[in-house]
Amino acid sequence: YACNMPTEHGGGGLNAFDLTLVEKHLGFASLALAEVAWRPQNILMACEGELIDEYLKPTITGERKDCIAMTEPGAGSDLRGMKTKAVKDGNDWVINGTKHFISNAHISDFVVLFASTGEDDKGRNLLSCFLVDLKQKGVEVAKGYDCVSHRGYVNNILNFNDCKIPLR
């Protein structure tokens, strides 16, 4: 479990190549087996302070599960084309938008969410990453798309409607 996380944080210590081999062989039978080797998103290693205890450590021990949300209708995986926005409002961020093809969101506790927080001087999206609890008001986890080639794999649609999360 958490085989991609460093051993000093309680993970399995596998490097990217070894993890790829594990997932490749599990995937020959069924993507459902990949649940056995559930792995936290590597970006969680950037957590600091209270976020380590709230998100990173419980995800490594299996107490909490995460998913990652970047893909959007109309933009696919083109992050610069994403429409999901996060806007500062006092001591909160307010998030609005839709993500789709989100693996296993229905069994996750929180999402590693990428959203646009403004534009640069050339009009390109500035992106930020947020940790959002999926039981948070303003978050809807909906059934995604049936995938013929992915036995045991479930993807979801995430809708964010005036979802408020505190500035940290």
Where are these regions (language model features)?
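Short Ser/Thr-interspersed hydrophobic loop/turn segments at strand-loop and sheet-helix junctions
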Residues: 22-26, 115, 132-137, 161-165
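Internal helix-loop-helix
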Residues: 1-63, 103-110
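Hydrophobic, small-residue-rich alpha-helical packing segments that form membrane-like cores
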Residues: 75-78, 88, 93
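Short Gly/Pro-enriched turn/cap motifs at secondary-structure boundaries
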Residues: 59, 74-77, 101-104, 120-121, ...
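A short core secondary-structure module
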Residues: 96-141
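A short, Trp-centered hydrophobic/proline-enriched beta-strand micro-motif
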Residues: 62-70, 114
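Flexible, small-/acidic-enriched active-site or ligand-binding loops
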Residues: 81-83, 135-167
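Structural signature of FAD isoalloxazine-binding scaffolds in flavoprotein oxidoreductases
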Residues: 13-25, 78-82, 159, 165
